[in-house]
Every structure is written in C-alpha cells, then in structure tokens.
C-alpha cells in the first residue's frame, strides 16, 4: 500500500539528515497517515480511507459527504 493520503494527496518527501559536522545523508519524510472508517449517513455505510492528519481536519471542516464528492469527481474509487 502506498504512503499517499487519499484526500489531500500528501506523499513521502525526501531530504537530508544533517549532522553537527554538516554531513548530509538522504532520508525520507513520511506523511502522518491513518486508516480511518467514516460513517456516511447518506449512503448508510462505512467508508474506509487512508488519510493524513491534515485531511482529518479537512473532513471535520467540510464534512465527509463533500470530501467523497470531490474524490469521486477526481475518479477515485471509494
């Protein structure tokens, strides 16, 4: 399973670890992903999404119905 948020599209980023001596080694910054179930009252079912903490705030703000509508408009299977 890829480390990509289904709602916000956040994905793994790359960068460097930097030591005190300024030595640089490559590293990955992982998104804060959670697999969550959301109750969709209009469809009378649970929907399971892999979302970032940022996307959870978006869902709280806009509602799960609006977020699912946007996902389906993008062509994502939900």
From Swiss-Prot:
Listed GO biological process terms: translation
Biased composition (Polar residues): 11-22
InterPro entries linked to this entry: Ribosomal_bL28, Ribosomal_bL28/bL31-like_sf, Ribosomal_bL28_bact-type, Ribosomal_bL28_sf
Keywords: Ribonucleoprotein, Ribosomal protein
Gene Ontology cellular component list: cytosolic large ribosomal subunit
Homology family: Belongs to the bacterial ribosomal protein bL28 family.
Entry protein name: Large ribosomal subunit protein bL28
